[in-house]
C-alpha cells in the first residue's frame, strides 16, 4: 500500500468555469458535459426566444444548469426550479446560477425526476433527457421524465424537449404529455413542444 499527500500548491481542480456566448457554466466532478455546452442543449437554446414566457418553469435533468440559467436571464419575471439526481450536477448548477446572477430566482434541487414537485405547479418544463445510464444506452429514462413533466404541468403548460432524432420520442410525447409540434430539427437533434391537455 502506498499513499501520497497532495502536491503543495496544486490546488483543487474543481470547480471549473467556462463562458459560452455570455453564459457562465460552472462544473464540479462528474457533471454531464462539464463546462462544455453539449450540442443538444446548444440547439435547444437557439429557440430560447420562441419559448413561452412562464412564471413558473422547470429545468428537468438540469446538469450544470445551462438551460435554467439561460431561461432565467432571458425571462426576469420567471421563477425556476432546476432539478437533477446527481450531486455533482446540483452543486454545479447552484454555482452556475450564482455566476449568472440568477440564483435568487432559480431553486436548485436534488431529486429523482420531479418527485418533490407538486402536481400542476409549472407553466413550462425544459428537458434534454439523458439516454445513457452509466455507460449503457437506454431509452427507459426519457418516458419516466416525460410522465413527471406531464404531472407537474398546469393544463396548457408546455414541455420543450431536445432529443437525438434517431430516438423518435414524438409518439411517446404525444401519448404521455399531449399534442406535440416540432420546433426545429438538424442533422442530429429534434426540438419539440408538447402541450399538456
Regions found by a protein language model. Name each.
Residues 1-18, 164-197:
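Class I S-adenosyl-L-methionine
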Residues 1-56:
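SAM-dependent Rossmann-like transferase core, predominantly class I methyltransferases
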Residues 39-127:
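Conserved SAM/SAH cofactor-binding pocket of Class I
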Residues 82, 161, 182:
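Conserved SAM-binding loop
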Residues 84-88, 141, 164-165:
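Short beta->alpha hinge that forms the Motif I/post-I loop of the SAM-binding pocket
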Residues 124-136:
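A short SAM/SAH-binding and catalytic strip from SAM-dependent methyltransferases
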Residues 142-155:
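A short glycine-rich, Lys/Arg-flanked "PGG" loop and its adjoining helix->strand segment in the class I
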Residues 156-162:
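Conserved beta-strand signature within the Rossmann-like core of class I S-adenosyl-L-methionine
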Amino acid at each position: 500500500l502506498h499513499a501520497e499527500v497532495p502536491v503543495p500548491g496544486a490546488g483543487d481542480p474543481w470547480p471549473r468555469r467556462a463562458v459560452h456566448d455570455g453564459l457562465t457554466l460552472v462544473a464540479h466532478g462528474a457533471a454531464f458535459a462539464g463546462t462544455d455546452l453539449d450540442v443538444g442543449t446548444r440547439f435547444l437554446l437557439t429557440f430560447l426566444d420562441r419559448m413561452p414566457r412562464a412564471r413558473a418553469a422547470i429545468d428537468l435533468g438540469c446538469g450544470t444548469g445551462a438551460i435554467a440559467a439561460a431561461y432565467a436571464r432571458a425571462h426576469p419575471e420567471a421563477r425556476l426550479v432546476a432539478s437533477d439526481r446527481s450531486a455533482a450536477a446540483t452543486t454545479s448548477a447552484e454555482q452556475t446560477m450564482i455566476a449568472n446572477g440568477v440564483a435568487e430566482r432559480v431553486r436548485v434541487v436534488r431529486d429523482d425526476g420531479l418527485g418533490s414537485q407538486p402536481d400542476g405547479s409549472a407553466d413550462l418544463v425544459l428537458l434534454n433527457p439523458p439516454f445513457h445510464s452509466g455507460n449503457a444506452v437506454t431509452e427507459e429514462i426519457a418516458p419516466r421524465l416525460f410522465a413527471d413533466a406531464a404531472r407537474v404541468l398546469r393544463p396548457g403548460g408546455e414541455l420543450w424537449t431536445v432529443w437525438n432524432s434517431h430516438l423518435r420520442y414524438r409518439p411517446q410525447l404525444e401519448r404521455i404529455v399531449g399534442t406535440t409540434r416540432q420546433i426545429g430539427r438538424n442533422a442530429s437533434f429534434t426540438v419539440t413542444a408538447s402541450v399538456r391537455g
